């Protein structure tokens, strides 16, 4: 599954610095980077040059991370990660100065408003955008404030949404949302203010589990938003419930799933894979390495 491969790349290669000193952008605009920044530069070069899947493709850009000159390694890593033309293929590899928060984030834990939003652009308002609520997390600030799927947000802190403030909907400790509804093809003129305060919470990726009848058949429906480790312990119970209800069909909705651990993916697959494929030993998952690691694999084998 492609999404797993992408997410594992993040988990394995997110360039979290060793040690306790944070690697902040060097405010010195001239001269050489500070020792901590220089260490981050070299670490990024070593990891990207050796372990990164597209190491050959970005090799020429690693010079931008020179410990002698690079004062913004986090920004440079983000800018040089693999593109195909103007398309950003790798959206996940990152250098971070907050490894604890990163580890929490890949476990679904972090400071959040407890919602997922999709961005849209007004056709008749130059430079202005709107946000549509895709879903809200159980017991999160958004749900507790009455937000629901389909709500439309047209202002942030009383101002129209633009490229300059759109991230306030995610990256602030509090926000005032101007929320409206869609009536037909038009946004309703009625706007209500919803105030949210971010909380540190676990966003359960098992968003919906239900059973319904369709065409004379019983269907199990699971909305699953991330292959984290914690949810791997709950998935077997979900499928036991489906089995107890004698479902005929199963829908697993992964539209908002950003990836996660292959371990959890394998648990899910073990509960739904057709027996014929299992007995035939069909390939379910493959791992792809760059040329350096592929050569090591060939020489040393799985051990």
Language-model-detected regions and their locations in the chain:
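Loop/turn elements at helix/coil->beta-strand transitions in domains of secreted/extracellular proteins
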Residues: 131, 149-151, 191, 217-220, ...
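Sec-exported extracytoplasmic/periplasmic mature domains
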Residues: 46-53, 138, 152-158, 240-244, ...
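Bacterial Sec-dependent N-terminal signal peptides
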Residues: 3-5, 9-39
């Amino acid at each position: 599954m492609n999404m797993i491969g992408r997410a594992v790349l993040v988990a394995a290669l997110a360039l979290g610095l060793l040690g306790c000193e944070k690697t902040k952008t060097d405010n010195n605009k001239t001269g050489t980077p500070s020792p901590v920044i220089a260490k981050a530069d070299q670490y990024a070069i070593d990891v990207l040059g050796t372990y990164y899947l597209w190491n050959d493709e970005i090799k020429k850009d690693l010079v931008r991370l020179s410990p002698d000159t690079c004062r913004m390694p986090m920004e440079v890593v983000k800018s040089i990660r693999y593109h195909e033309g103007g398309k950003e293929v790798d959206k996940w590899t990152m250098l971070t100065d907050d490894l604890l928060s990163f580890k929490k984030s890949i476990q679904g834990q972090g400071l959040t408003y407890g919602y997922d939003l999709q961005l849209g652009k007004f056709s008749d308002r130059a430079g202005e955008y709107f946000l549509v609520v895709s879903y809200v997390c159980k017991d999160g600030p958004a749900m507790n404030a009455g937000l629901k799927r389909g709500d439309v947000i047209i202002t942030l802190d009383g101002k129209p949404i633009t490229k300059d403030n759109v991230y306030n909907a995610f990256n602030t400790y509090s926000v005032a949302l101007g929320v409206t509804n869609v009536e037909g093809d038009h946004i309703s003129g009625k706007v209500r203010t919803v105030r949210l305060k971010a909380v540190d919470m676990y966003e359960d990726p098992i968003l919906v589990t239900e059973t319904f009848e369709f065409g004379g058949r019983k269907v199990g429906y699971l909305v699953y938003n991330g292959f984290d480790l914690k949810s791997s312990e709950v998935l077997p119970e979900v499928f036991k419930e489906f089995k107890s209800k004698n479902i005929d069909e199963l829908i697993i909705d992964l539209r908002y799933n950003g990836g996660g651990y292959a371990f959890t993916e394998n648990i899910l697959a073990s509960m739904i894979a057709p027996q014929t494929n299992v007995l035939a030993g069909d390939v379910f998952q493959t791992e792809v390495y760059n040329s350096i690691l592929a050569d090591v694999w060939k020489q040393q084998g799985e051990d």
